């Protein structure tokens, strides 16, 4: 069965606290034909993400005011199981052209972290990190590398957090096997965060097989090396040389 996925605008890097992961979960419940996430309770979000109900309520209030993410929210209060429940209908704003994809398995990933609140904090960090990765990759490359490695001061400014918080997040992410340091930057290892895009064509399927093999075997994946051509009718044609010379030695699974 094909995995379900969600598209997320890179504008989530401009929101604070745990709002990115809360928005991502709401978006994952959206009907793509109507752009509506219906019958989503704040209690459901709290239980699914492992964060307090009060934190979710504050996050939802902030998201309601951000028209780049949520157009409007219609609340319906009902009595269920002897108590009031508020079901929200979220009219989700249309993504601009700058977005990325995640598999919905991301929300169920325990990341080998026992504490749910810590998992959610890390997931929120990974989503925001993805927004500033090199286009169609899960690699963040420093503009001004420090000793051929990650420039943490630069990264903290791009994420809008202080370096102390960044260091804690990076340490947790490395220990949980969610990122690794590479030359001049770092690589997101979580395979629920799609490096490029979700498309059912042979080139993309082959690239994802190569990509997953690399992640599983400790190899830094090759970038998608598409040649992009915009046609007269405005359509986009991609041509992909799938196996760069440096990766032709890899033994990959057979495509069926």
What are these regions (language model features)?
Residues 75-98, 184-206:
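Short, cationic-aromatic polyanion-contact patches
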Residues 65-76, 174-184:
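A short, conserved structural fragment
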Residues 236-238:
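Short linear proline/tyrosine/threonine-rich motifs used for host-factor recruitment
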Residues 43-52, 152-162:
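Short helix-coil junctions and helix-kink-helix linkers
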């Amino acid at each position: 069965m094909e995995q379900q996925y969600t598209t997320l605008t890179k504008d989530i890097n401009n929101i604070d606290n745990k709002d990115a992961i809360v928005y991502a979960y709401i978006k994952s419940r959206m009907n793509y034909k109507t752009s509506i996430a219906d019958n989503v309770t704040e209690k459901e979000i709290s239980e699914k993400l492992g964060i307090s109900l009060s934190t979710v309520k504050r996050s939802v209030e902030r998201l309601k005011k951000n028209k780049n993410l949520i157009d409007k929210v219609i609340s319906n209060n009902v009595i269920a199981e002897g108590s009031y429940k508020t079901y929200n209908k979220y009219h989700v704003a249309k993504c601009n052209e700058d977005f990325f994809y995640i598999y919905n398995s991301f929300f169920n990933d325990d990341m080998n972290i026992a504490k749910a609140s810590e998992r959610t904090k890390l997931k929120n960090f990974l989503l925001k990190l993805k927004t500033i990765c090199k286009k169609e990759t899960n690699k963040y490359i420093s503009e001004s590398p420090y000793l051929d490695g990650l420039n943490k001061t630069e990264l903290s400014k791009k994420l809008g957090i202080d370096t102390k918080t960044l260091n804690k997040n990076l340490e947790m992410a490395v220990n949980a096997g969610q990122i690794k340091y590479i030359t001049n930057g770092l690589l997101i290892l979580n395979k629920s965060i799609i490096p490029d895009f979700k498309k059912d064509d042979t080139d993309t399927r082959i690239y994802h097989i190569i990509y997953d093999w690399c992640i599983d075997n400790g190899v830094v994946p090759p970038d998608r090396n598409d040649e992009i051509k915009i046609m007269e009718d405005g359509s986009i044609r991609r041509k992909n040389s799938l196996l760069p010379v440096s990766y032709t030695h890899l033994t990959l699974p057979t495509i069926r």
